[in-house]
Swiss-Prot record:
EC assignment: 3.5.1.44
Lineage of producing organism: Bacteria, Bacillati, Bacillota, Clostridia, Eubacteriales
Name of the protein: Probable chemoreceptor glutamine deamidase CheD
GO biological process: chemotaxis
A Pfam family of this chain: CheD
Matching CDD domains: CheD (cd16352)
Main function: Probably deamidates glutamine residues to glutamate on methyl-accepting chemotaxis receptors (MCPs), playing an important role in chemotaxis.
Catalysed reaction equations from the record: L-glutaminyl-[protein] + H2O = L-glutamyl-[protein] + NH4(+)
Single GO MF descriptor: protein-glutamine glutaminase activity
Tree of life domain: Bacteria
Keywords for this protein: Chemotaxis, Hydrolase
Assigned protein family: Belongs to the CheD family.
InterPro entries xrefs: CheD-like_sf (IPR038592), Chemorcpt_Glu_NH3ase_CheD (IPR005659), Cytotoxic_necrot_fac-like_cat (IPR011324)
Length: 162
């Protein structure tokens, strides 16, 4: 079997089977949602930018939003034979990358993304077993389909495993 490495861009999602890896870079206020099925060794990763699609009239990319991307990722994994009840989640990102004196104007998008991702996963009844969220550092997230291990490369900190 070939050990593939799949890259997921911003506002994108994808799947990889064992022994492959799937990764996303540039997680600032964005969130990486890693879903893993231990039985089938299928890994899914989503890189969301915004919490809620209902604020927009024309949604051209559902993968941009937590409320749409997570159900879409689950459906793609189910189409490959996963059972939703076997999925576990690990999340990373949601940093406050900029300091604004008046947060009411822009809101803390990182914090809102964290809340939206947790809400969506809870509604889908998928347990978050590990997280590294908040703070003010950018992250790269790598999910290994062999064992579900997530490796984070955090700017100014180094490597963290979830």
């Amino acid at each position: 079997m070939e050990n593939t490495e799949v890259k997921v861009g911003i506002a994108d999602l994808n799947l990889v089977s064992s022994p492959g890896k799937i990764m996303t870079i540039g997680l600032g206020s964005c969130i990486g949602i890693a879903l893993y099925d231990r039985r089938s060794k299928l890994a899914g990763l989503s890189h969301i930018m915004l919490p809620d699609s209902t604020q927009f009239k024309n949604v051209t990319n559902p993968m941009k939003f937590a409320d749409l991307a997570i159900p879409l990722l689950i459906k793609k994994m189910e189409a490959k034979g996963c059972l939703k009840r076997n999925l576990i989640a690990k999340i990373a990102g949601g940093a406050s990358m900029f300091s604004f004196s008046d947060k009411s104007m822009v809101g803390d998008i990182g914090k809102r993304n964290i809340q939206a991702v947790k809400k969506s996963l809870s509604e889908e009844r998928i347990q978050i077993i590990a997280e590294d969220v908040g703070g003010n550092k950018g992250r790269t997230m790598i999910l290994d389909a062999l064992d579900g291990k997530v490796t984070l490369k955090i700017v100014g900190i180094g490597i963290v495993e979830l």
